[in-house]
Amino acid sequence: MAKLTVKDVDLKGKKVLVRVDFNVPLKDGVITNDNRITAALPTIKYIIEQGGRAILFSHLGRVKEEADKEGKSLAPVAADLAAKLGQDVVFPGVTRGAKLEEAINALEDGQVLLVENTRFEDVDGKKESKNDEELGKYWASLGDGIFVNDAFGTAHRAHASNVGISANVEKAVAGFLLENEIAYIQEAVETPERPFVAILGGSKVSDKIGVIENLLEKADKVLIGGGMTYTFYKAQGIEIGNSLVEEDKLDVAKDLLEKSNGKLILPVDSKEANAFAGYTEVRDTEGEAVSEGFLGLDIGPKSIAKFDEALTGAKTVVWNGPMGVFENPDFQAGTIGVMDAIVKQLGVKSIIGGGDSAAAAINLGRADKFSWISTGGGASMELLEGKVLPGLAALTEK
């Protein structure tokens, strides 16, 4: 990566602005998954160990109007972070103004401050999400000319708290998490050790058209599962019962199949049910066709075996999207089967592209078996598509 990193700048005595991704799930004010906070710790610890004063920015959820602020404060995150760091985290509870400025100016070397949810600035004109120039300049003015972007999860967005600050500081650099995310995902796609197998699941072809096109050029095989299977099936005239289908993407699916040169591998059977919820019958299909009155909700046992065979000997695997409705035990065998097929390959570099796939690996107890699990679903998708990420492009060149 030809961008400056946090190790390339002198941090001692400096007020260092840091964009982290603390967009964690909260239930009744309690954090239910702290992975993103843990992922940011190496960069934060490095800054304070070097004598920097870390000023952290993050969003939490979506905030469009005043009422949306309820339950979206970063206060619980500040408490959790303090416990993880073993030191106080200053939390003024505001995004701008005298209270924030005084707290920042009172910081000493090695201390940490967390600014309130950056999206509170979206209430009046979407200043954060629309990269308001004045807001970016203001936040940049709170530091000493150094900005560290460690939020891969928002790197595909041009917001005031990443691109806006970057444009108004002397040096905008990558944190360790951002550096690792780019290294793992970009290197896997651009310079993979082969055979390189990509696995794409999820419900919609429309979400993955660009990714499939890019990976058909880069990968040796592209395995397709999840709900989008049935759009590919219908495009070939295969009966799909009541399964999910994107009627307006049938021509796209047909086109992808035609130009894939056999690289695109589809499931050969499904686990079908007579309803999505409240079903009374679940069974494996004989072949590709889904029965009338039924819908496919997972890949079937023959498909698991086929995908296992396709993954044999793989040296690089990128997986994005579950094979079925994995949250339901009746439809998680496909996702488990594919995960197990990936991790049993010797010497494989295995990467999960965030989102539902990451949740599946964590919930189904396979997370520690993968080389890398991305913290950013949308950002990793755009990297897999070969797109330039605004948050990364805005950083200072080496």
Curated annotation (Swiss-Prot):
Keywords assigned by UniProt, alphabetized: ATP-binding, Cytoplasm, Glycolysis, Kinase, Nucleotide-binding, Transferase
Entry-linked InterPro entries: Phosphoglycerate_kinase (IPR001576), Phosphoglycerate_kinase_CS (IPR015911), Phosphoglycerate_kinase_N (IPR015824), Phosphoglycerate_kinase_sf (IPR036043)
Positions annotated to bind substrate: 21-23, 36, 59-62, 119, 157
Catalytic activity: (2R)-3-phosphoglycerate + ATP = (2R)-3-phospho-glyceroyl phosphate + ADP
Transmembrane intervals: none
Pathway noted in the entry: Carbohydrate degradation; glycolysis; pyruvate from D-glyceraldehyde 3-phosphate: step 2/5
Location relative to the cell: Cytoplasm
Example of a GO cellular component annotation carried by this entry: cytosol
Documented EC number(s): 2.7.2.3
Source organism, top-level taxon: Bacteria
Entry GO MF terms: ADP binding; ATP binding; phosphoglycerate kinase activity
Positions annotated to bind ATP: 208, 296, 327, 354-357
Enzyme class: transferase
One Gene Ontology term from the biological process aspect of the record: glycolytic process
Chief place of localization: cytoplasm
Quaternary structure and partners: Monomer.
PANTHER family per the UniProt record, alphabetical: PHOSPHOGLYCERATE KINASE, PHOSPHOGLYCERATE KINASE 1, CHLOROPLASTIC-RELATED
HAMAP family per record: Phosphoglyc_kinase (MF_00145)
Family of the protein in this entry: Belongs to the phosphoglycerate kinase family.
Protein name in UniProt: Phosphoglycerate kinase
Organism expressing this protein natively: Streptococcus agalactiae serotype III (strain NEM316)
Name of the gene this protein is made from: pgk
